[in-house]
């Protein structure tokens, strides 16, 4: 669902995109580093201000030529895997939108999140909310995790599993329902959606 950062759309409407970020996919059995597609992520909050006018214009133009269309990676309407521009590896990404943990909450649980710029970390800081943290994907393979005492590993595993598999289910469903119905009602085209990989239960 992405557009190139060199596209006319990104040049004309830079406020509709997070040009400091890249869309991709989290690691899986086929890509242990995840995927980095290079597209800027959407600034959905800004797009919502005019009722998703940019999207609706695209849909109306498509309807002049097609009766049906396929959304590849439809999960992007629920959430996207977002990687800060300095990084190439999907390991340093995070979900957007998301419900990160506050630094205070993590410190109260015995963790000391720190933005070192290194990839060997347990948490990555949210790029738009200072001192709010996302568990780093696949962090159980890091030296930082290996050095934790067993009780803190157990605490981290509980936090990690909740974050990636439960915490966002209702949140992401609500996120998609704010966008998709309004866009699909714009035209009479038949929509088909496809995705694979880490699919939340709410999709």
Positions of predicted regions on the chain:
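Catalytic cores of glycan-processing enzymes that make or break glycosidic bonds
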Residues: 1-203
